[in-house]
């Protein structure tokens, strides 16, 4: 049975992990946030979050966006390929409803799950 936990092993933890994702990465974006992905050699996907204070001013807004991103990843993790993903928030993300954010995440997860052309 699949577990839907979001354990430590499913997170990007060190600056080196993030730097690896930014090199030779595939991008999928919307006007509200971008997801950057790179293949990993693990048996599961991992998630990292970048929600700058410059983009989303309030801690409440940043925490809300991160909570929704983690929840979307947690629910989709079994359909995702073995890649490292970094979600980068943009200023307009704070204006979306929770439902709109989830729909956008689903669309971008699907786009990044397709086999790459190169």
Curated annotation (Swiss-Prot):
PROSITE patterns membership: RIBONUCLEASE_P (PS00648)
GO molecular function, one term: tRNA binding
Job of this protein: RNaseP catalyzes the removal of the 5'-leader sequence from pre-tRNA to produce the mature 5'-terminus. It can also cleave other RNA substrates such as 4.5S RNA. The protein component plays an auxiliary but essential role in vivo by binding to the 5'-leader sequence and broadening the substrate specificity of the ribozyme.
Cellular component terms per the entry's GO annotation: ribonuclease P complex
Keywords: Endonuclease, Hydrolase, Nuclease, RNA-binding, tRNA processing
Keyword Hydrolase applies: yes
Gene Ontology BP term (one): tRNA 5'-leader removal
Family assignment from sequence similarity: Belongs to the RnpA family.
Protein's UniProt name: Ribonuclease P protein component
Reactions that this protein is recorded to catalyse: Endonucleolytic cleavage of RNA, removing 5'-extranucleotides from tRNA precursor
EC number(s) given by UniProt: 3.1.26.5
InterPro entries named among the record's database cross-references: Ribosomal_Su5_D2-typ_SF (IPR020568), Ribsml_uS5_D2-typ_fold_subgr (IPR014721), RNase_P (IPR000100), RNase_P_CS (IPR020539)
Subunit organization: Consists of a catalytic RNA component (M1 or rnpB) and a protein subunit.
Record flagged with keyword tRNA processing: yes
